[in-house]
Structures are given as structure tokens and as C-alpha cells.
Amino acid sequence: MAKTSITVRHQRKKKFEVREYNRCPICGRSRGYLRRFDMCRICFRKLASGAQIPGVVKSSW
């Protein structure tokens, strides 16, 4: 979990647009972010394995 201060600081608008970056809204993680699902890889894996994200199926071949 990200520190509360970092999460709050991220919500403020940056002076320069280039400095903005994505954060997971669930845990606040900045790395491993999946744009398509708007969350980090860890939260995605947890929710996908629990069948809470519609349309996501575990692949097997």
C-alpha cells in the first residue's frame, strides 16, 4: 500500500502535464499499472482469479 501522503499528493494537478502518472485506485501502486483495467497487476490478478472482472478468463493451452 502506498503512503497516504503520496496518494494525496498524486491527486493534485501537476504543474507540467508530462509529470502526471497513473496510480492504482485500489492500492495506490504506481508500477505495474494496466491502463485497460485501471489498476495494478497485483490487484488485477487478485480480482481476476476471484472472477470479479467480467470478460477476463484465465488462459490455458
From Swiss-Prot:
Keywords: Metal-binding, Ribonucleoprotein, Ribosomal protein, RNA-binding, rRNA-binding, Zinc. Its cofactor is Zn(2+). Zn(2+) binds at residues 24, 27, 40, 43. GO terms for cellular component: cytoplasm; small ribosomal subunit. PROSITE patterns: RIBOSOMAL_S14. Pfam families: Ribosomal_S14. GO terms for molecular function: rRNA binding; structural constituent of ribosome; zinc ion binding. Binds 1 zinc ion per subunit. GO terms for biological process: translation. The keyword rRNA-binding applies. It comes from the Bacteria. The keyword Lipoprotein does not apply. PANTHER family: 30S RIBOSOMAL PROTEIN S14 (PTHR19836), SMALL RIBOSOMAL SUBUNIT PROTEIN US14M (PTHR19836:SF19). Binds 16S rRNA, required for the assembly of 30S particles and may also be responsible for determining the conformation of the 16S rRNA at the A site. Belongs to the universal ribosomal protein uS14 family. Zinc-binding uS14 subfamily. Part of the 30S ribosomal subunit. Contacts proteins S3 and S10. This is Small ribosomal subunit protein uS14. It comes from Leptospira interrogans serogroup Icterohaemorrhagiae serovar Lai (strain 56601).
